[in-house]
Amino acid sequence: MKALHFGAGNIGRGFIGKLLADAGIQLTFADVNQVVLDALNARHSYQVHVVGETEQVDTVSGVDAVSSIGDDVVDLIAQVDLVTTAVGPVVLERIAPAIAKGLVKRKEQGNESPLNIIACENMVRGTTQLKGHVMNALPEDAKAWVEEHVGFVDSAVDRIVPPSASATNDPLEVTVETFSEWIVDKTQFKGTLPNIPGMELTDNLMAFVERKLFTLNTGHAITAYLGKLAGHQTIRDAILDEKIRAVVKGAMEESGAVLIKRYGFDADKHAAYIQKILGRFENPYLKDDVERVGRQPLRKLSAGDRLIKPLLGTLEYGLPHKNLIEGIAAAMHFRSEDDPQAQELAALIADKGPQAALAQISGLDANNEVVSEAVTAYKAMQ
């Protein structure tokens, strides 16, 4: 089996690329970073530090790389069995034209073996969005052929991969946590379902997408925002602060009550999942900076994201949300010189006041009681 993976960054190399290569799949990375491309093509291998209770070093081998903006990537799409991405939500639109060209070439070459495309991004139904961009870039006479022969498979991914702090200055070395979860929608595949260790198949993807969003992402963000306010540097330092831990755990329990109502998750198993995530935040090997985790607060405070979406769920089912409100208030305080969204957030609050600003960012009605609750909590933090 041959695969092409867009994005040779830390997540691409440390998570999806590693799973594919470990499964014995012939893997080519596509990226724009020439230093990384040259290193991959010179060595055909790289090291991954897997850290949890213990630390181990795995070697990923048998890989190569191409530029994601050249002809090679188009040729590969015409040949491979699987295309995956870990490029970030914003970049999906940029890689779509190359994918479209490759699919046209595949059709012209008469290659009718099934191709499946899986976007492995920190977003809901990212592959469906990528499919929209690809379809827009395709000529009309190729669209029906693509619908018939190409599967666009949505997935949920979860693995903490902090920015590399390689002591060796090796551009390929990467550190990842032991935990990883890659759940894919088995109803969207074309052809035979793949058997890749570490890839879980489900016919109820949204339950797992929201479980991750409402637990890991919600908890991670609130830990970062409260941690930054309290002067902590890392996620570990923040979650070891008992006051912060109580709010984070409380928020995950509040969002968890929504998941249990909505999808019928087992309450005891979900409580264990929350404990596992708190343990991941404590990982001493992951030097995960609160500023990195907190960045892009406007996106994280938007209606479909990790803070407001679970809050809306608590309103839908008439459930408590005190800790989620604390997290939202802390997010409104997030300031970072390196993050344009943090600066935009500050300007919006200064211009409109916290109530109107939060309403605009979140899509909530300014007169909604929860907006007032968040503003009260926000002011109490000043």
UniProtKB/Swiss-Prot annotation:
Modified residues (N6-acetyllysine): K269
UniProt: NAD(+) binding residues: A3, L4, H5, F6, G7, A8, G9, N10, I11, G12, R13, G14
Enzyme class: oxidoreductase
Protein EC: 1.1.1.17
Superkingdom, natural source: Bacteria
Reaction catalysed by this enzyme: D-mannitol 1-phosphate + NAD(+) = beta-D-fructose 6-phosphate + NADH + H(+)
GO biological processes: mannitol catabolic process
Cellular component annotations (GO), alphabetically ordered: cytosol
SUPFAM superfamilies to which the protein is assigned, alphabetical: 6-phosphogluconate dehydrogenase C-terminal domain-like (SSF48179), NAD(P)-binding Rossmann-fold domains (SSF51735)
HAMAP family: Mannitol_dehydrog
Family recorded in the similarity comment: Belongs to the mannitol dehydrogenase family.
Protein name (record): Mannitol-1-phosphate 5-dehydrogenase
